[in-house]
Structures are given as structure tokens and as C-alpha cells.
């Protein structure tokens, strides 16, 4: 079966729904932990599930280069390879190619680059990206696009967006009769009119879901919110809406307020490894000396394995001594915190108390609720 999206209820622009796959149901709004190389760094699949994750993200670009789809297919597909029995979304490789900067060359055909592993010259095209994602057995496949850099002139952003639209058409053609869901990615830089053209082009082609790409690439927060505010309400109502690569807990709340259903970001896992831990009142920098003698848990309100079993002083000690257990315990906590933010939003939407949830979320942080335009 292909993915089925059900929209249950709304509160303002915030949406409560679910995506139904053969491998399970994903209640939305949802956060997807990033498992770039077939692993959420330092975590077993069971531990990731225990945080509340319903779906995870894999990286086409990296998995194509190493270990390669041939080895993955010897196990079945990516689910079997990494022992994850829930849905997987794979990104197309477009963003990673964008990250290579000067090491890549973009043409109408695709992107040519040197493998960061062995220097081999590789051509990644929309067709190749679809083929690799099919071999990975992805449940949600992302089209191959060019992530518009920031800053970009309107002419540069237009040219990039138009190329992405042509690649979207080719991605859809190559995807063919595959049972996996195929999502289009809206580009257009920081220009509303280009975002509109991109969205219209993608909806004319027709996809199972739509993502906002090209944000969280170094632009000021105001620009991100401006584009999100403009674009999200125009996205098809009966299809999932995905904001790629975002963000902090506050960003998730603000994006849900504006109608987004899905998120992914490395922030909870990467910040965990750097000792930056999210709690209901803000961020704890566990490396700081103030935690050296603190016997209290990281977050009194958290039900994660870390908070139930260890003190701030112990986590501080692990961080200071560079013990790998520290990164693991921190990651368990941060991922659970993110999943709890999402499940609390879902519960509030179910109960019709979403506005109250938002007020309490910001009250705990000593912040006022940002205005919706």
C-alpha cells in the first residue's frame, strides 16, 4: 500500500493527523530523528523507539557511497540492515551535494562530485537518486533537488528553483509505480514569489506530500519565519507538510502553529554530543562547573532513562572525562525531550487546548508567545 494521510482536526492553522504505512502509523505532528548512516549516532534502534520515535531518517548520499546499496540489499533493505521495523524517510542527497560547495559541478543532467571517501568521480541525477532510494526500501522518498544557498540573488534563486522543478518532473517519472510515498520539495530562497511558483509547479506534477526546503541554511530567523508564514498555508491541505532540517524546540512549536506536520533535525543528537541538553525551561550546558555537585536530575519533569537514573553531577563528570556513555545518555534525553514536545502538542490538539499548551511552553521559558502574522 502507499502512504495514507488522515487529517483529524485543526486549531487555528495547527493540524493533527497521521500518516499510515504498511510498516506502521506515524501520528502527526511528528519529529524524525536523523540516522544519516543507518544509525542514530550512539543509539540502538530499540533505544530510539523508546524515546517515542515513530519514523527515522536515512541519508541517500552517504549510504550510496558507503556501504552501498548492494550490501544493504543483501540484508533485504535498509530496515533489515539497521534492524528498524518502522517507516524510514530518505532524503535525496541534494542537501549533502549542496554542502560540498566548490567540490561539485551542477548541470542540467545532475551533479558531478568527487567522493569524499575515495575521490572517485560520481554523477548523481534525479533518476539515480530515485533508484538508490528504491533500493534502500524507503517508505518516504524525497525528490532530487538543488538546495538554494543563502544568500542568493533573486535571479540565482529563480534559476536554482526552476532547475529543481525540472528535476522534480524527472524524479516523479523515474519513481513510476513504486509503492513508496514521493514528496516534492519547495525551493525559491527568501523570495515569496519564487516559493509560489515552485509550489504551483510541484502541485501541477502531483506528489504524496510536500516539503519546504532551503531553510535553516544560515538565513536570519526572521527570514525563515517569513517564508514559512507565507508558504505553509498554501500547501495542499490533504497532504503532509514537512519542514526540512528544523530546528530548536521553539521552532517546532512555531512551525506547528503555522500548519507543519513533520520535522527532522540533527540538533537534538548533535547538541547532546556537545553537552547542550534541552529541558522544559531552556538549555542546560552540562559542561559548566555549576553542575559538578548537583545531585538533581537533568529535568524533574522528564521520564527518560537518563533523567530517571542519573544526576546532573554524573552527566557533568561523563562530559568532562569524554566518556562515550555521556554522549549516549545525553542523546537519549534530548531525543526523548523532542518526542515529548511533539506528543504534548498532539495531546493538546486532541483535547482542544493547543493555545494553552503554547502559552505554558513559553511561560516555562520566561518568554512571551510570538505573534502569528
From Swiss-Prot:
Superkingdom assignment = Bacteria
Region feature RNA binding, mapped onto this chain: 245-251, 269-273
Gene Ontology CC = cytosol
Cofactor requirement: Zn(2+)
- For substrate, which residues are the binding ones? 91-95, 145, 187, 214
Q: Which residues bind Zn(2+)?
A: 302, 304, 307, 333
| GO MF term (any one) | metal ion binding
The biological processes this protein is annotated with in GO are: queuosine biosynthetic process; tRNA wobble guanine modification; tRNA-guanine transglycosylation
Read off the InterPro entries from this record: ArchSynthase1/Queuine_TRR (IPR050076), TGT (IPR004803), TGT-like_sf (IPR036511), tRNA_ribo_trans-like (IPR002616)
* Bound cofactor: record note: Binds 1 zinc ion per subunit.
Q: What is its EC number?
A: 2.4.2.29
What pathway, per the record? tRNA modification; tRNA-queuosine biosynthesis
Catalytic residues in the record: 91 (proton acceptor), 264 (nucleophile)
Pfam families reported for this sequence: TGT (PF01702)
Keywords of the record, alphabetical order, are: Glycosyltransferase, Metal-binding, Queuosine biosynthesis, Transferase, tRNA processing, Zinc
Protein's job: Catalyzes the base-exchange of a guanine (G) residue with the queuine precursor 7-aminomethyl-7-deazaguanine (PreQ1) at position 34 (anticodon wobble position) in tRNAs with GU(N) anticodons (tRNA-Asp, -Asn, -His and -Tyr). Catalysis occurs through a double-displacement mechanism. The nucleophile active site attacks the C1' of nucleotide 34 to detach the guanine base from the RNA, forming a covalent enzyme-RNA intermediate. The proton acceptor active site deprotonates the incoming PreQ1, allowing a nucleophilic attack on the C1' of the ribose to form the product.
* Family of this protein: Belongs to the queuine tRNA-ribosyltransferase family.
Q: Which PANTHER family match?
A: QUEUINE TRNA-RIBOSYLTRANSFERASE
The record's subunit annotation is: Homodimer. Within each dimer, one monomer is responsible for RNA recognition and catalysis, while the other monomer binds to the replacement base PreQ1.
Identify this protein by name.
Queuine tRNA-ribosyltransferase
Naturally occurring in which organism (per UniProt): Idiomarina loihiensis (strain ATCC BAA-735 / DSM 15497 / L2-TR)
Q: What is the lineage of its organism?
A: Bacteria, Pseudomonadati, Pseudomonadota, Gammaproteobacteria, Alteromonadales
Q: Which gene encodes it?
A: tgt
Amino acid at each position: 500500500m502507499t502512504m495514507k494521510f488522515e487529517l483529524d482536526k485543526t486549531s487555528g492553522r495547527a493540524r493533527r493527523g497521521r500518516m499510515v504505512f504498511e510498516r506502521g502509523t506515524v501520528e502527526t505532528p511528528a519529529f524524525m530523528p536523523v540516522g544519516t548512516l543507518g544509525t542514530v549516532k550512539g543509539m540502538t534502534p530499540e533505544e530510539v523507539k523508546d524515546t517515542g520515535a515513530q519514523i527515522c531518517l536515512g541519508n541517500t548520499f552517504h549510504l550510496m557511497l558507503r556501504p552501498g546499496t548492494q550490501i544493504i540489499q543483501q540484508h533485504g533493505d535498509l530496515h533489515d540492515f539497521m534492524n528498524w521495523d518502522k517507516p524510514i524517510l530518505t532524503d535525496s542527497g541534494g542537501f549533502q551535494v549542496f554542502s560540498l560547495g566548490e567540490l561539485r559541478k551542477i548541470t542540467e543532467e545532475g551533479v558531478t562530485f568527487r567522493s569524499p571517501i575515495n575521490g572517485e568521480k560520481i554523477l548523481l541525477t534525479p533518476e539515480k537518486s530515485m533508484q538508490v532510494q528504491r533500493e534502500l526500501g524507503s517508505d518516504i522518498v524525497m525528490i532530487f533537488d538543488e538546495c538554494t544557498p543563502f544568500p542568493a540573488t533573486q535571479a540565482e534563486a529563480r534559476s536554482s528553483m526552476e532547475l529543481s522543478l525540472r528535476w522534480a518532473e524527472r524524479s516523479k517519472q523515474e519513481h513510476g509505480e513504486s509503492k513508496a510515498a514521493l514528496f516534492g520539495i519547495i525551493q525559491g530562497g527568501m523570495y515569496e514569489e519564487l516559493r509560489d511558483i515552485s509550489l504551483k509547479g510541484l502541485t501541477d506534477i502531483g506528489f504524496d506530500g510536500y516539503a519546504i526546503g532551503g531553510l535553516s541554511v544560515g538565513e536570519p530567523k526572521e527570514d525563515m519565519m517569513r517564508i514559512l508564514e507565507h508558504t505553509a498555508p498554501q500547501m495542499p491541505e490533504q497532504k503532509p507538510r514537512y519542514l526540512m532540517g528544523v530546528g530548536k524546540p521553539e521552532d517546532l512549536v512555531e512551525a506547528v502553529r503555522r500548519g507543519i506536520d513533520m520535522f527532522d533535525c540533527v540538533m537534538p543528537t548533535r547538541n547532546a554530543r556537545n553537552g547542550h541538553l534541552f529541558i522544559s525551561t531552556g538549555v542546560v550546558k552540562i559542561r559548566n562547573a555549576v553542575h559538578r555537585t548537583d545531585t538533581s536530575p537533568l529535568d524533574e519533569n522528564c521520564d527518560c532513562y537518563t533523567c530517571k537514573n542519573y544526576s546532573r553531577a554524573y552527566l557533568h563528570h561523563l562530559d568532562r572525562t569524554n566518556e562515550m556513555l555521556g554522549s549516549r545518555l545525553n542523546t537519549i534525553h534530548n531525543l526523548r525531550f523532542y518526542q515529548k514536545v511533539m506528543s504534548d502538542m498532539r495531546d493538546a490538539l486532541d483535547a482542544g487546548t493547543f493555545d494553552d499548551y503554547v502559552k505554558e511552553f513559553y511561560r516555562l521559558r520566561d518568554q512571551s508567545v510570538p505573534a502569528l502574522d
